[in-house]
Amino acid sequence: MRKIERIFITISLFAVVTVTASAIWHNLNKPEQGAVQSIPTTKYGAFLATQHAVFVNDFDTAVKLTENLRDVESPIVQNTIYLSDFLAGKMPLDAHLLKNEKSMPARLIYDAYLIQNDNWKELYNRHKSDDSALAAPLRIWAAVANDKQADALKFIEKLPTNSSWKSFVRGQIYAEKKDYKKAAENFMAVDPSFLNINDYLYIMSFYIHHDMIDKASKLLKEFTSMRGGMCMLAYDNIPEWSRFAGYKNQLAFSLVQNVSHTQIMMYSDLAMLLLRFVQITAPEFATSNNVMDYYLGNFFYHNTGNWQKHFDNISQDSPYYLFGLLRSADKTGKIDKLQEAQKKHPLFVPAVNKLVAHHIQHGNKSDALRIIRHAMNDEHLNDAGRAFFAKGRAQINFAFGDLDAAQSDLHKVSEALALDAEILSLQAKIWAMQNRELDNAYEYAMKLVKHNPADVLAWDTLGLVVAKREGADAALDVLERVGEVSTTCSSLFEHLGDIYASKGDVNKAIDSYVRAIELSDDGLTVIPLIEKKIRKLK
């Protein structure tokens, strides 16, 4: 059979795929979601339409369009067929022909073919000298599958990554090789702040399956003490260990972990190749807790394609269900479903933040406070969790001008939580608005700016304090320069508007207030209050 030419080289949209996740299929003119494409009657038309379908991430349509192209022997056409099949989650029929190809997509497709056929020996030989970060999971698990875990452990030590990841993957290897004591030791060495929900479920499943209840309880306490993990306090639908055990499942987990922990990769076209790799090689893992639906939906959400289909597929007992609703609310602006779900899951912090910001934005103080109160009344919440939500209540009261209530909450919060940037910023703003403790407020604000000069909220805090401490002109020196380049932080523009209004510059004041309204979905300003200020100027 003829030698397949180097795959994808002649397809313009696949000009480059790198470990840094350079764009492959970015589309400047995105079609309307759900648009129906007609099937061309000519082979040439079908070929062009297939390339376009891949270009706009409509992979299912791409596969349908290739049905009349399967007998065309042109390398360009065959390459397009291979790619369309794989990106739709199907192993290409002639994937074995890609053995000697060098491009990244072709190598991944052939690697998936080897794993699907349990040919771990050839996979190991292909990757045993591969030092690339992208291929690390393939090299590690091919070595382990060939009883060369010593090689895998040595390779892990050489990788320029953080210690928690190294401990995690070492734990995976020991767990797979049934050295449960060493596995547990490594899992316990993982910093809880490293874990996302998928990582947490993996370790919890390991602990529960192997009767390590004390360790499971410790992990539950540590993970749920963080704002991102609070939603798991009452969650008990931990997957069976069989969903993670086995070389295929372990590799699949590692690939998803790499995608989920690398933000630049998570939203890139490289992520789609790896996620389809997982679906094809480890279908049992891929259906566990709708993890793949969430990450596939995330890819389409941040690019183009039918993200809604994947989020809608997530079952209500999945920990990813609420994240899917949150993404949908962000995209559509409709919060009804998220609001109903949050009533059942009051400790899902991203939903709390989203809904509170929405109610502050629209002047619904009582609704914003009700969400916080509902969370604080949850029986599973610990003292640190209540303090966290009390900090949110302080922000609500500050936004609506109830400074005494905000200060009261902040005193309680500072007794239970370490002083973070949010606490320091809010305290400095309260003092500034009350025109007291201005030297301390200035010290707090300067500390925030020095700690993170890129934080617009820190500059907003400094500007508000300087306005009270040194006057409007000094504050303008701070806020105007930041406002020229800032696309976030509605309160900064409200404060700019206040200063312009105090100086009698009506036009600049109104422009700043309008900009504050445009950015007000961050929950830092109240639209009805800003509109009232605008009316007073007209």
Annotate the PLM regions.
Residues 406:
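Amphipathic hydrophobic-ligand
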Residues 426, 461-464, 468, 480, ...:
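C-terminal soluble interaction/assembly domains
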Residues 25-373, 382-403, 418-434, 450, ...:
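Alpha-helical solenoid repeat scaffolds
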